[in-house]
Design a protein with these regions (language model features):
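A short, charge-rich alpha-helical start-of-domain segment used by transcription regulators
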Residues: 1-19, 29-32, 43
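C-terminal edge and immediately downstream basic/flexible tail or linker adjoining helix-turn-helix-like DNA-binding
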Residues: 2-6, 134-135, 152-172
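Short, aromatic/basic-enriched loop-to-helix "N-cap" motif that marks the start
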Residues: 15, 45-61, 140
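Structural recognition of an alpha-helix C-terminal capping motif at a helix-to-coil junction
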Residues: 33-40, 53-65
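Arg/Lys-rich amphipathic alpha helix in sigma70-family domain 2
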Residues: 48-50, 61-82, 96-97, 156
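Internal acidic/polar
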Residues: 77-106, 128, 168-171
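A short pre-motif secondary-structure segment
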Residues: 118-122
């Protein structure tokens, strides 16, 4: 079982796990179930956890693999983008920004699960390429090429509404 310090770290990671699960499942109830399932798996396998492993990476790996397992076994994963929720802000600064944001969200929703997961892990959750490679159990070069293809697909799906960056930033 986790120590008090690890228990605190675990509690701090729950909102991030839920956010990632929500993007994967596109359903709040399914996301909660997925997080609960991942935490149950983590706690039941706590003694087999390597001490030098990052708790964050370990939990995200478990969550992602539980998602894939559930998807395979259920054979009925269907996501709906149908309606975009209104932002919490009362209004956007410009119509152009709102249009770009909606186009990006719609395009993001049409990406494959693999592409969406990669973009979420790197761009939203802040994982390094190395951490994502370890999490998905693939070489770092594979992560980089898949991420590049995911970004290109996102630009294509948004009908050119997402600008191509002139300078590419590389993460360590």
């Amino acid at each position: 079982m986790p120590s008090t310090d690890q228990d605190d770290q675990l509690r701090e990671l729950i909102p991030r796990l839920r956010r990632f699960a929500l993007w994967l499942t596109r359903d709040a109830h399914a996301a909660d179930d997925l997080v609960q399932s991942a935490l149950e798996r983590a706690l039941s396998r706590w003694s087999s956890r390597r001490d030098d492993a990052s708790l964050r990476s370990w939990l995200f790996t478990i969550l992602y693999r539980r998602f894939l397992d559930g998807k395979r076994s259920a054979k009925r994963y269907a996501w709906l983008l149908g309606r975009l929720q209104e932002p919490d802000e009362p209004h956007w600064p410009s119509a152009e920004r709102e249009f770009t944001a909606r186009a990006t969200l719609e395009a993001f929703g049409r990406l494959s699960d693999e592409q969406r997961s990669l973009l979420l892990l790197v761009a939203v959750e802040g994982f390094s390429y190395r951490e994502v490679a370890d999490l998905l159990d693939v070489p770092i070069g594979t992560v980089m090429s898949r991420l590049s293809r995911a970004r290109q697909a996102l630009r294509q799906l948004s009908d050119g509404e997402i600008p191509v960056p002139s300078l590419r930033l590389m993460k360590k």
